[in-house]
Curated annotation (Swiss-Prot):
Entries under PROSITE patterns matching the protein: PANCREATIC_HORMONE_1 (PS00265), PANCREATIC_HORMONE_2 (PS50276)
Cell compartments where the protein resides: Secreted
Designated name of the protein: Pancreatic polypeptide
Any Pfam family: Hormone_3
Family: Belongs to the NPY family.
Task of the protein: Hormone secreted by pancreatic cells that acts as a regulator of pancreatic and gastrointestinal functions probably by signaling through the G protein-coupled receptor NPY4R2.
GO biological process, one term: feeding behavior
InterPro entries (alphabetical): Pancreatic_hormone-like, Pancreatic_hormone-like_CS
GO CC annotations, alphabetized: extracellular space
Superkingdom in the source lineage: Eukaryota
Length: 36
């Protein structure tokens, strides 16, 4: 199973938040991908 991205914290930089958001979206896509 893919690793869940770690929340960078409330005082993270916008770049860190954007990176986290992108990783989280990819993680969720991997979890919800249908397995035929």
């Amino acid at each position: 199973a893919p690793m869940e991205p770690v929340y960078p914290g409330d005082n993270a930089t916008p770049e860190q938040m954007a990176q986290y958001a992108a990783e989280l979206r990819r993680y969720i896509n991997m979890l919800t991908r249908p397995r035929y």
